[in-house]
Amino acid sequence: SSAVVMACRAVKDEEEIRLTQKAVTIAEKAFRALMNEGARFFIGKTEKQLSAELSYRMQNLGADRQSFPNGIIVGSGPNSAGAHHVPTDRKVRKNEPVLFDFGALVDGYCSDVTRVVFTGRKIDPHLRDIYHLVKEAHSLAIKAIKPRRKASAIDKVARDHIMQGGYKEEFRHGLGHAIGMEVHEAVRFNQTDHTPLKKHMVMTVEPGVYIKGFAGVRLEDDVLVTADGCRSLNKLSCHLEKFILT
């Protein structure tokens, strides 16, 4: 059955890990190059244009294509509050957040990364607080990952932290999912999946807080479960200051 196939696919071999790592590296390299263009490059462009631009850059670096069925997510300003926002013709403005959820497909394996950039130094203090809360939840969840721990227990670590920060309904999806030949594979970091983690599973960790009409923050890495913990396949930091475009 497909459940059996998915269970087998959850644990990756060395070659699968290598290809997933390559997919992460290419995605991040393309995103870094895009950020290096500076705020001026972003301001005035539509979400659709930025989505296409990042997709093109990933392919230019050797990706087969971007890894999502519906394309790269780009949500600017209040649109960053849509957890699965489809890019529109809205033009990016100065001093606002732009959420990018993107990934590359390389030789059949996917990556899935989310970062938020800011098109100027004026960041709403409320948004800054949300960013730091999400970053802490992201980091705590990664520290909690180890073999034999239940997937649901990892979700709880991040969810509890976000709840203590005053947000419950605003974190409106699971913490993450297995990734491999498909972007979303069977094992999920959510409240109902009690699958014990195993060495060499590759999982996303993507806490988020979304305030309708205001903004949203999600930070996502792809992590490899190791013998005694986990290792992030990402090199791109989550430090807010690094994502302020000048």
Spans of model-derived segments:
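Active-site neighborhoods and metal-handling regions in enzymes and metal-associated proteins
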Residues: 1-246
